[in-house]
Design a protein with these regions (language model features):
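Structural signature of hydrophobic alpha-helical transmembrane segments
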Residues: 1-3, 78-83, 137-144
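N-terminal signal-anchor/start-transfer transmembrane helix
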Residues: 2-16
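Divalent metal-coordination and catalytic microenvironments
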Residues: 4, 26, 73, 133, ...
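Hydrophobic residues within alpha-helical transmembrane segments
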Residues: 2, 29, 120, 140-143, ...
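Hydrophobic alpha-helical segments of secondary membrane carriers
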Residues: 167-168
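Transmembrane helix-loop-helix hairpins at membrane boundaries of multipass inner-membrane proteins
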Residues: 14-116
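Conserved small/polar residues in nucleotide/adenosyl-binding loops
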Residues: 175-181
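A conserved hydrophobic secondary-structure block that centers on an alpha-helix together
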Residues: 88, 92-140, 145-163
């Protein structure tokens, strides 16, 4: 689950030292590896017990003890396969698409930023579908909203992309109001 976050950090912060192409390939490879592992877990090739896996204690204050935990059940296994498999295909498609992208001037470094956003979106979606408590679900929900805004507005030089990103942000913000009632 934390693999795409690692890929996002590598693509976002290390592309200057390791190169843009290496960063994008690493981010893509991490998501593909996650998809392969999710298929093994889904098909019960790797034995994973149902329940919750506590990653770390998050908030401890008096009688309040909130843990960052990953829920493991049949639904989560299915959603891990869906999210990681689709994200792998999107990453692979983006590798080819970005190779011939004419929306930027030659020499501009932008591909690593896109893959950082895309990997962060994958991570936020994984947090959302595997959350064990409402606080963690909220962070996944908000992460998906932020990542959507960043991805939709990626071509920030185009006014249409900026308008679409703002519309998406407003729509997602409106739907956030309904989260506590569901």
């Amino acid at each position: 689950i934390f693999g795409p976050l690692l890929g996002s950090l590598i693509a976002g912060f290390m592309y200057r030292s390791i190169g843009e192409n290496v960063a994008t390939i690493l981010a893509t490879s991490i998501v593909i590896l996650g998809a392969i592992i999710s298929w093994f877990v889904f098909l019960d090739i790797v034995a994973v017990d149902s329940g919750s896996v506590v990653v770390f204690d998050w908030i401890i204050s008096g009688s309040l003890n909130s843990q960052w935990a990953v829920k493991v059940d049949s639904l989560v296994k299915v959603m891990l396969v869906v999210v990681l498999s689709v994200s792998s295909l999107v990453h692979l498609y983006s590798l080819g698409y970005m190779r011939h992208d004419h929306n930027w001037n030659s020499g501009e470094k932008y591909k690593a930023r896109f893959f950082s956003y895309l990997s962060f979106f994958t991570f936020a979606m994984l947090v959302l579908v595997s959350s064990d408590n409402l606080l963690q679900l909220f962070f996944g929900w908000e992460g998906v909203g932020v990542a959507s805004y960043l991805l939709i507005g990626f071509y920030f030089k185009k006014p249409t992309a900026n308008n679409a990103a703002m519309k998406a942000f407003i729509a997602v913000s409106y739907t956030h109001l309904t989260l506590p009632t569901t």
